[in-house]
Amino acid sequence: MARNEAAIKRTLEKQICMRCNARNPQRASECRKCGYSNLRPKSKERRAA
């Protein structure tokens, strides 16, 4: 499967809220849903099921 750079950027370059798990833009400083400021980058590797 070929990896499309635009698709990777759109799906993986996100910030995840540690409180409510909402997806936020890469440059966000606080969550768009709950206002929490502790955001983590979305994992680039798939987790084992």
UniProtKB/Swiss-Prot annotation:
Keywords assigned: Ribonucleoprotein, Ribosomal protein
Listed InterPro entries: Ribosomal_eL40_arc, Ribosomal_eL40_dom, Ribosomal_eL40_sf, Ribosomal_zn-bd
Single Gene Ontology BP annotation: translation
GO CC list: ribonucleoprotein complex; ribosome
Record has Ribosomal protein as a keyword: yes
SUPFAM superfamilies: Zn-binding ribosomal proteins
Coiled coil: none
Name of the molecule in the record: Large ribosomal subunit protein eL40
Lineage, uppermost ranks: Archaea, Methanobacteriati, Methanobacteriota, Stenosarchaea group, Halobacteria
